[in-house]
A protein has these predicted regions:
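Acidic-enriched and Gly/Ser
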Residues: 2-142, 157, 162, 167, ...
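Short, charged beta-turn/beta-strand-edge "cap" motif at the junction between a beta-strand
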Residues: 148-151, 172
């Protein structure tokens, strides 16, 4: 077989039919220098690398005024959606030191796409304050939110300090939790169907 010099198509993996398979991207957690999260996100965007910085708006009260402030939900961390080539490019930024890895391993920990979609949905549509819980929460009942701004979100119903919360688990990072009335959720089975 003769491969032309500039024909990169032949060097990519192929599926059964022979067409090129797209390079797979995955979500990783990059560790960032303290207070450099927003700047790093801007630089990654300029480089053309998809990234996600979880920011939540909060109202801060002083004696003479109130101000809406953006708060980084996970300090010193930014999510990047990269393939192997972009994974190396991200580390060229001086504000990024490394990727979060699994304990005892050297490969970066991958956050599943479904978890990221649920987490982003929760951040985008929640009216309530989202809290991150790193302490282990007992697995809760699988539920789907049926009312309110989070309608359609699937997660777990957990009880923390007597309050019902919907939790979205993130690999290696714990749970993102938000208060929700128990009447706004319905149980679902493992495959996503309604339970009787």
């Amino acid at each position: 077989m003769i491969i032309k010099k500039n024909d990169d198509r032949n060097l990519l993996p192929t599926d059964v039919i022979g067409s090129c398979v797209a390079r797979s991207k995955r979500w990783l957690v990059a560790i960032v220098r303290i207070c450099h999260e927003k700047k790093t996100g801007e630089r990654l965007t300029k480089m053309g690398i998809e990234n996600f910085l979880p920011i939540q708006q909060e109202v801060h009260q002083w004696s003479d005024r109130r101000k809406i402030v953006d708060r980084v939900l996970l300090p010193m961390m930014i999510f990047v959606h990269v393939d192997l080539q972009e994974q190396k490019e991200v580390l060229t930024l001086s504000s990024i030191s490394r990727y979060m890895v699994l304990r005892g391993e050297s490969t970066p920990a991958v956050i599943p796409d479904q978890q990221m979609l649920r987490f982003k949905f929760m951040l985008d549509y929640s009216d309530e304050t989202i809290s991150m819980s790193t302490s282990p929460l007992a697995p809760g009942e699988k539920i789907r939110v049926i009312k309110g701004p989070l309608a359609g979100l699937e997660g777990e119903l957990v009880h923390v300090n007597g309050k019902s919360k919907v939790a979205v688990r993130l690999t290696m990072l714990g749970c993102a939790c938000v208060d929700i009335p128990a009447g706004c959720v319905e149980p679902v089975s493992e495959n996503g169907d309604l339970r009787d």
